[in-house]
Amino acid sequence: MAALAAAGLALGAKKGKPLGVQLYTIRSLVPTKARESIQALAQIGFKEVETLRAINNVVLPLCKEFGLKPVAGHFDLAMITAQPSGFQKAIDEAQAAGIKYIVIPYVPNGDRGGPDVYKRMAKAINEAGTLCAKAGLQLCYHQHAFEFGEVQGQRPWDILLSETDPGTMALELDVFWVSVAGLDPVKLIRDLKGRAKLLHLKDKAPGVPKQYSEAVSPGAFREVGLGSLDFPAILKAAADMKVEHYFVEQDQTAGDPIGSVRTSFRNLAKLGF
């Protein structure tokens, strides 16, 4: 913890960014404790949220009430590829909520395949991204680990990046999943040269084996500062590459999700947030 605090002295003045939270983290609380959960996030000190469409009707009014700004939202891949009518609905919903970044959160197993599948996906993403830009919004892609595994000699990651226009598809980089796939988040952030506009922040337990599947042990997920990732270096690279928004996220928590994000918030505060 002392190392976190010391690093914060060097990093704090450079970022000046508000810290957000991905509401997927509190999905289990929304059915019965939505109001107190959103209020708790505001009391912790979060200023921004990233939403997911399935719970927007419940959480968006509460975010407005408690002063949490929705800046990004997860919309299912099926909406993104259903142009133009299906995707226009995503644009309309985002604009109504004040969301700037429409994020593709996940590619379901049934939508994965060989290189041609990802080339077709990239074409649809380019079309959706163009519609986004015309509406004053930004389309982003959130990666997991599978994108870094080879399929017929090619990585989906490389296909998606090379076949899409950086102006129409930015990235939401999840540092946990980058590390699970055996890559260095710091190097990847820098290699992307500013294409990563959003960052998901969560830590990884020591000793988690390299893999391209999302089927990791729940114990692999750790709060920021309680795992093996080098967050001072990650945040320095992100600041240098002008990442625009940062979101704490925990796919799985050992206990209370609110307590989990509180821990990450406090440790990130020591790094200058």
Q: Where are the language model's segments positioned?
A:
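Acidic (Asp/Glu)-rich catalytic clusters
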Residues: 14-16, 38-43, 56-72, 86-99, ...
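Acidic/histidine-rich catalytic cores of soluble enzymes
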Residues: 133-228
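Hydrophobic faces of well-ordered beta-strands that scaffold small-molecule active sites
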Residues: 17-22, 49-51, 70-75, 102-104, ...
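Active-site acidic/histidine proton-transfer and metal-coordination neighborhood
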Residues: 6-8, 48, 78-170, 191, ...
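Acidic-and-aromatic substrate-binding clefts and catalytic sites of carbohydrate-active enzymes
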Residues: 27-32, 48-60, 77-85, 109-113, ...
